[in-house]
């Protein structure tokens, strides 16, 4: 006989959100360690006219990491609301999210710390594919979660 799980408490939901925020901003910190001298390096690059100014990266990435965390939290909540914990599709969606988050943190190291432009280009293409796939699977689990990743995909 199957037993029903009690509904998730507000406290547990908030702890989940804090956990996803902490994870996303930990990835940001890992990337940030590689980007300590990024300002001077970025200023020296030959950039197209449409490239954003260096000062814009901090505010934009703060917003993007927050949106990523909320999107992952919504998918996690969806999985938690299933009768037996995470449904297989929410687990797969969250694993894909973690893969793109790792690729995101790695890119700063490849480009800013190791200054390997060719590898950074290949890695950013992989990252974009991972973000696109994550956006799609998040959309299928919970539409709002997919929508929240669209600015990240566009950036």
Feature locations, PLM:
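Helix-adjacent hinge/juxtasegments
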Residues: 66-108
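Alpha-helical transmembrane segments of multi-pass membrane proteins
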Residues: 24-40
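N-terminal membrane topogenic signal
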Residues: 7-21
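Short aromatic-rich membrane-water interface segments that cap or initiate transmembrane helices
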Residues: 47-60
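Membrane-interface helix termini and inter-helical loops of multi-pass transporters
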Residues: 37-49
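Membrane-interface helix caps and helix-loop-helix hairpins in membrane proteins
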Residues: 109-119, 140
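Interfacial loop-to-transmembrane junctions
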Residues: 136-154
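Structural signature of hydrophobic alpha-helical transmembrane segments
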Residues: 59-62, 117-126
């Amino acid at each position: 006989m199957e037993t029903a799980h009690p509904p998730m408490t507000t406290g547990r939901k908030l702890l989940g959100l804090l956990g996803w925020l902490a994870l996303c901003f930990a990835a940001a910190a890992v990337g940030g360690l590689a980007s300590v001298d990024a300002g001077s390096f970025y200023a020296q690059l030959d950039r197209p006219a449409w490239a954003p100014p260096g000062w814009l990266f901090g505010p934009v990435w703060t917003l993007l990491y927050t949106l990523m965390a909320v999107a992952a939290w919504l998918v996690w909540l969806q999985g938690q609301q299933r009768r037996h914990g995470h449904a297989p599709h929410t687990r797969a969606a969250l694993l894909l999210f973690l893969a793109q988050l790792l690729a995101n943190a790695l890119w700063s190291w490849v480009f800013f710390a190791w200054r390997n432009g060719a590898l950074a280009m290949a890695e950013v293409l992989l990252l974009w594919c991972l973000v696109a796939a994550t956006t799609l699977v998040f959309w299928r689990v919970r539409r709002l979660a997919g929508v929240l990743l669209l600015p990240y995909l566009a950036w």
